[in-house]
Regions:
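Bacterial N-terminal signal peptides
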Residues: 7-14
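Long, low-complexity serine/threonine/glycine- and acidic-rich segments characteristic of extracellular
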Residues: 24, 39, 45-53, 57, ...
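Short, compositionally biased P/S/T/A/G/V-rich stretches that sit at domain boundaries
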Residues: 21-43
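Positively charged n-region of N-terminal signal peptides that target proteins for export
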Residues: 1-4
Length: 137
């Protein structure tokens, strides 16, 4: 019984040691799509524009409190706080501090999730994300 307790305690400590750090957020901080609007019908090629309130938009690289950059997730959920945002064809990184992007999507219904993350791409979580739906014609 003592061995089981000890093993459980050690495993718990190990999990705590590798849990991702959750970046701190200023009160009232948020991101938003300025274009397109939720539910909009768009052409296969369109421009998405993003904004951030309560934090400063900066290039990726240095991790500084109150700063970060945008990521756009196509047809996927927001990245949990503290986790690194993936980088692939559906997880677009805007590490140069961009606040808009030209997108080309196939016809149909798509979700776009804007996700803000720190200079090392660690997600600020759901508070710093917004998901909209677009109908591509």
């Amino acid at each position: 019984m003592k061995a089981l307790f000890l093993a459980t305690a050690l495993l718990s400590l190990n999990l705590l040691a590798v849990a991702p750090a959750v970046p701190a957020l200023p009160a009232g901080a948020k991101v938003a799509f300025t274009s397109p609007k939720d539910g909009a019908t768009v052409a296969t090629k369109f421009t998405a524009k993003f904004s951030v309130t309560g934090m400063k938009l900066e290039k990726a690289g240095a991790v500084k409190a109150g700063t970060g950059h945008h990521h756009l997730i196509i047809d996927g959920p927001a990245t949990p706080a503290g986790q690194i945002v993936e980088k692939d064809l559906t997880h677009l990184h805007f590490g140069n501090g961009q606040s808009e992007a030209e997108l080309t999507l196939t016809p149909g219904k798509h979700t776009l999730t804007l996700q803000f993350a720190d200079g090392a791409h660690a997600s600020y979580g759901p508070q710093m994300s917004q998901t909209i739906t677009v109908n591509v014609k």
